[in-house]
Amino acid sequence: YCRASYIYVAGENEEDILAKAEEAIESYVSVRGYTPKVLAIKGVGILAVGDNAKNASEIAEAFVNALNTALESESAGGLQPMPQSQIDSVDGGEAKEYQLKVNASTGYGRAENKVFIVTGAAQGFGEGFARCLVKQGANVVVADLNETTGMQTAANLNSICTTNRVIFFKTDVTDIACLSELVKTTVCEFGGVDVFVSNAGVAIAGDLTQMLPEKFEFVTKINYNAFFYCAKVVTPVMKLQNKYDEELFGDIIQINSKSGLEGSKANFAYAGSKFGGLGLVQSFALELAPYRVKVNAICPGNFLDGPLWSDPVKGLYVQYLNAGKVPGAKIVEDVREYYLSKVPMHKGCTPEDVTKGVIYLMEQTGETGQALPITGGQVMLK
């Protein structure tokens, strides 16, 4: 898995390490004809280079096992170097062919080998969205405050992975230090971040007479402030990645709402936070375009079959019924039918719908600062 030799790099600072690593890799490739599988960097750690996340994880494990074996051999007479014929068998022949076959890419998804961070992905729409990404071959970091559910979600998603992987990181999106650790952990696990999806959000309905200031501030902190925090912590990584690959783009995507495109009666806290989010999207897009970091938003319609709407206690059907948002509505089903009637396609939005939009935004390289509506025609661009 690790091939016959690795690269060791020692430098005075980050710039020195990067320069020496680049020089060492070029020399390694020119001599051996292939890229190194392991880079050992003094004071930093071991970097495993694989064709996909599963392969890289196996390389790292194999190399650490080899180091442990070498250490243990000191008590049994020391290391015994392999003859050249055995070394050659590591870099070629049947062993190499078997490894290539085992680690072959499936080529089954449009997001294959991409690294996604998705906040609010432990349950509900976020979980469904993360599941769709995994099926498209993505490596996904489930970032959520709910540790028990989040870890179970990661385990469930890993069960359908092939060459990709899923990890969980307990995340409070209102804590910028926590978000910094999220990005750091992602880089350590997967080597970088391709797409950061700011999905975590809350909706608390109520008119001016009902809405309490503390609830308004709570909605604003999660839906608006947190997007700024997310963009701030992931931007340095994306800039650095793109600096060394002129064909690489990074993506920051906010899952916004149709309520970010038009006002929402008795729902101003939510709509206001989403309108503000689009202002951040456009402003960040202007700032980051020179670094090939695209910033866009998805504005979904209503997830009428998801828990955000259908929860019997805190769901939006119940909230809107109690707030009198739907004229003449007497039961929850009246609220549901009212919202279905507003959609020309007569369907609620789904995680599959949003996933297609996110992958489109990731693949294209000609747009930034855009708000892509996925509303079944309920909101049409003017």
Residues covered by each model-derived region:
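A glycine/serine/threonine-rich, flexible loop-to-helix segment
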Residues: 304-342
